[in-house]
């Protein structure tokens, strides 16, 4: 990862006209992706994320705005130069689009046809690409003989045939089971590290973003509503939609649902509070529960606990029932906040979370 911008989208609008109606799919979006990033763009269906990334290689012509890739004005390129520029931007999709009548090796080598490589050089390159994605032994097989995950690996190898600097993954894991999804994401991360490949990951699953991305942008109704580095977004989200995505990815939603269903059995009184504690980095190593009791005689009953490792940074979540005198509870809150811990008072009757 560097601070050198490889993709710069500025003030992008994409508007469609159909039967007298105007639909704005992307509205005034600016986005910078640096070389070596794995940049996640997350949003629900219809948020505009796929339309936005298709602007990068001009598969979608924007209504307004500018697009620079590797310092080139993509929107100003004539057809011939645009075709050359597109060879440096690979794409993979939810559907693999493999040719059923061709072998795996032929599918991977197809983008090389008509190029400058000799037949022997093409064969050598295809063998290398298949080795990269772990499918050397499948070279002579046909797509029908492969699993979904293997087919996506073939699609990745094919997308790398022209040595792209950028790989756009547009919902490429959406049709795969969780285990296969994880293996594909690990492959993308390895390619990013070994080849210096810049990856733009389009997804509706924050879990995928959490696995491999270093930066993330959240889209809603054609706009980017929040963006930043992964740890900051997960530890300090500002928008409710972002928090919803994070809660789903960290399993907090499931924990809260169970806790709220049992809220009546908790029997909270004036000396008790249901609290979520979120802490990042070195704070995760501190013996927090012990300190709260030693300093303030506040007893914390842990209902849920989880620690995620994001970009080598620990991010912890606890849901606890704090018990103590009201003034001691207030002092315990202040202590947590001064230690860099985010404290949220949870209301079991809150319909937003229940």
From Swiss-Prot:
Molecular function GO labels: ABC-type D-methionine transporter activity; ATP binding; ATP hydrolysis activity
EC number, as in UniProt: 7.4.2.11
InterPro entries assigned: AAA+_ATPase, ABC_transporter-like_ATP-bd, ABC_transporter-like_CS, ACT-like_dom_sf, MetN_ABC, MetN_ABC_transporter-like, NIL_domain, P-loop_NTPase
Topology of the protein relative to the lipid bilayer: Peripheral membrane protein
Subcellular location: Cell membrane
Superkingdom classification of source: Bacteria
Major location (coarse): membrane
Cellular component GO terms held in the UniProt record: plasma membrane
Catalysed reactions, semicolon-separated: L-methionine(out) + ATP + H2O = L-methionine(in) + ADP + phosphate + H(+); D-methionine(out) + ATP + H2O = D-methionine(in) + ADP + phosphate + H(+)
Chain residues that bind ATP: 43-50
Keyword annotations from UniProtKB, A to Z: Amino-acid transport, ATP-binding, Cell membrane, Membrane, Nucleotide-binding, Translocase, Transport
Domain ABC transporter: 9-246
Subunit field text: The complex is composed of two ATP-binding proteins (MetN), two transmembrane proteins (MetI) and a solute-binding protein (MetQ).
Record function comment: Part of the ABC transporter complex MetNIQ involved in methionine import. Responsible for energy coupling to the transport system.
Family: Belongs to the ABC transporter superfamily. Methionine importer (TC 3.A.1.24) family.
Protein name: Methionine import ATP-binding protein MetN
Species for this entry: Levilactobacillus brevis (strain ATCC 367 / BCRC 12310 / CIP 105137 / JCM 1170 / LMG 11437 / NCIMB 947 / NCTC 947)
Lineage: Bacteria, Bacillati, Bacillota, Bacilli, Lactobacillales
